[in-house]
Regions:
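Conserved N-terminal beta-strand and adjoining loop/helix that marks the start
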Residues: 1-19, 35
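Conserved hydrophobic/aromatic beta-strand scaffold that supports enzyme active sites
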Residues: 12, 21, 83-85, 103
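Short, charged/polar surface micro-motifs in flexible loops or helix N-caps
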Residues: 14-19, 27-28, 40, 73-74, ...
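Conserved Nudix-box catalytic region and its N-terminal flanking loop in Nudix hydrolases
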Residues: 18-54, 140-147
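A short coil-to-beta-strand element that immediately follows conserved catalytic motifs
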Residues: 59-68
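Active-site-adjacent beta-strand/loop module that shapes the phosphate/pyrophosphate-binding cleft
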Residues: 72-92, 121-125, 129
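NUDIX/MutT-family hydrolases
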Residues: 94-126, 144-147
Length: 147
């Protein structure tokens, strides 16, 4: 059976020592995270992250940099989250149906109610020697690996 792949993105928008966070309302994955979403059919990865940040925050980012990935495989399907960072933006900040957006000090993020696994994802965003957060199944259990 061929493998299907779903591509999504997440962007850490930086403004000095502050980062833009989103307090997600989705009960399937609630908590503090970064804006992002699905790559649409025929859309480039870069265009997708620019569009998603704009839709969810009102900010137009430019020159986002790919800094890592999160991925997992289950039942002939792979899910890939592309991690971007951006420090150039324009526009007026506003929240969306995805959740409230606001600026927080980067140093304060570990104290906030982060979405599940967001602490490990944050390491991939920040640590230059990490580029992948991978889930695999071993003996019926999900194992997390930071690479």
């Amino acid at each position: 059976m061929p493998e299907s792949v779903t591509f999504t993105n997440m962007c850490m928008v930086c403004d000095g020592d502050r980062v833009l966070v989103q307090d997600r309302l989705d009960p399937a994955w609630p908590g503090i995270t970064f804006p992002g979403g699905h790559v649409e059919e025929g859309e480039s990865f870069t265009d997708a992250v620019i569009r998603e940040v704009w839709e969810e925050t009102g900010l137009r980012i430019s020159a986002p940099r790919l800094v890592g990935v999160k991925d997992w495989y289950s039942d002939h399907s792979r899910y890939v989250v592309l991690f971007y960072r951006a420090d150039r933006f324009s526009g007026t900040l506003h929240s969306s149906e995805e959740g409230e957006v606001r600026w927080e000090a980067l140093a304060d993020l570990p104290k906030l109610p982060l979405a599940p696994d967001m602490g490990d994802m944050l390491r991939v965003f920040l640590e230059e020697d990490l580029s992948e957060f991978y889930y695999r199944i071993e003996d019926g259990n999900w194992i997390q690996e930071l690479k």
